[in-house]
Amino acid sequence: MTAEQKNRIAEIDSQIASLMKEKETINPYSNLKSFSNKNFGEAWSEPHILARCPSFTKVDSKGYDFISDGLGKVEVKSCRLPATTVNQCHPNDCDYFLFALYDCDECEDHLYLVPSENFMEFSPTVQHDRGESGCYSMSLKTKKRQELLKQYKVSYDELELRAANN
């Protein structure tokens, strides 16, 4: 590769970085699909929720992610639309599930706070048959589940009020 070609590649890299920065300014969610699923949930979604709902406390627990005075133990399940499958759901380990669905194209959040006691209404699929009881997965895409979810939709403000026990 010639020195001129190396310089041109450096220019292109600089232009790409500049365009990516502009894209993220226009749509802060534009890069979310680049995260692995686990990293997206733990490194982006959970801190994003905590920043908007400070009454939650992050915990290092196997069965739930947050705790609060108003809601107790909350397990967060995050998806980037159009994907809507949630895995490793253990309704016996938490008081609520917070399904956080992020529309990366429209830069919108859709939050659903489902009491764990109502989780089985969604007819989830048993995820493991190796003796691990109470572990489920499900797609939130089905018409029946979308109808069920509507009653659990919350805004960040509503979520914060409930977490704070107000």
Regions found by a protein language model. Give the residues of each.
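Nucleic-acid endonuclease domains
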Residues: M1-G72, K77-N166
